[in-house]
A protein has these predicted regions:
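Hydrophobic ligand-binding cavity/cleft-lining segments
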Residues: 1-74
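Short, highly charged C-terminal tails/helix-capping segments
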Residues: 174-185
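Glycine-rich portal/gate segments that line the openings of hydrophobic small-molecule binding cavities
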Residues: 60-119
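Hydrophobic/aromatic beta-strand elements that line small-molecule binding cavities or substrate pockets
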Residues: 30-32, 94-101, 125-134
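Residues at beta-strand starts and edge strands
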Residues: 24-28, 40, 77, 126, ...
Length: 185
């Protein structure tokens, strides 16, 4: 695999938006309640997506492909996913899992996964935070996307809808997948 993936037009557009935003950002926050899904299942998921087939379980319509550019074998901080998904248009993303202590987004829940989407120079363009904690019926999860301030509103709405669908899928597939695979890691 080449070190630098081919860019889709959406990557170039995001880099232009980032420059025009001049360091200003906005946050998109989406809250979820997941019945029958535990924080431990979600913790397991992040390091065990592993294949495009498994990645597509998370959003059968929009997720197209997945591979580790840098695997999480030694812990997920520093791991890089290379994914293709459809958020209004085909989007190639390189997401690097970051140390939660370096999160520019305040963390409020007991479990947190922090990621940055990388530009062609491996610098963060956007940030995301999945944070979650147990509730009586399962897990409450909050996703926060920190985006350049000049991101078009239609993209923000498409991202919100994508996130709602993707996180809601956890309740459908994750309990069984976790139960079948939790000891094989």
């Amino acid at each position: 695999m080449s070190k630098k993936p081919k860019e889709f037009e959406s990557n170039k557009i995001m880099e232009q938006i980032l420059k025009r935003s001049k360091g200003k950002t906005i946050d998109l926050v989406v809250d979820h309640e997941l019945y029958g899904v535990t924080p431990e299942m979600i913790d397991w998921w992040w390091d065990n997506i592993d294949t495009s087939e498994r990645y597509k379980l998370w959003h059968p319509e929009d997720h197209k492909s997945f591979e580790w550019e840098v695997s999480p074998k030694k812990g997920h901080v520093g791991a890089i996913q290379r994914i293709v998904e459809n958020i209004g248009l085909p989007t190639l993303l390189r997401i690097r899992w970051e140390d939660p202590k370096s999160s520019p987004i305040p963390i409020e829940y007991s479990h947190a996964l922090v990621g940055s989407t990388l530009d062609q120079d491996d610098e963060p363009m956007t940030w995301l935070l999945h944070e979650y904690e147990p509730i009586e019926s399962g897990t409450k999860l909050r996703t926060t996307f920190r985006l350049p301030a000049r991101v078009p509103k239609p993209f923000i709405e498409a991202l919100r809808k994508h996130n709602i669908k993707e996180i809601s899928e956890f309740a459908i597939f994750l309990p069984n997948l976790y139960e079948q695979n939790k000891n094989s890691v």
